[in-house]
Amino acid sequence: MNNYLRKATVLIVKRGAEYLVGRIPYSMEFRWSTSPYDAWGTRDREKAEAVAGKLGGDLWLWNPVAGQLREYAN
C-alpha cells in the first residue's frame, strides 16, 4: 500500500494560486484551475521543469490519493 501511495505522487506546475491543466486545443493559450485535482501531472522531472520554466511557474509535489500537496525542493 505504501508503494502505491509513493507512485501516485506527481509533479504539477503552480503559478500564483492556480495549477496548470494543459494547453487549449488549437490555441497557444493554457488552461489553469484553482484545484490541484485538475492539474496536469508527470513523474518526469525534466519535463516538469521545462514546462514550469516556460510558463513561469513553480513545481509542487501532489498526491491525489492522500490529498497531500507540498512545494518541490530540488
Residue ranges of each PLM-predicted region?
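Short aromatic-glycine-(Arg/Gly/Cys) micro-motifs in beta-strand/loop hairpins
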Residues: 7-36
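Intrinsically disordered, low-complexity boundary segments flanking structured domains
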Residues: 1, 26-29, 45-48
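Short, mixed-charge low-complexity intrinsically disordered segments
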Residues: 39-74
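Accessory DNA-engaging acidic/polar modules
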Residues: 3, 13-16, 33, 47, ...
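Mixed-charge, polar/low-complexity N-terminal
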Residues: 1, 21-23, 40-41
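Short, ordered beta-strand-loop transition motifs
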Residues: 5, 34, 63-65
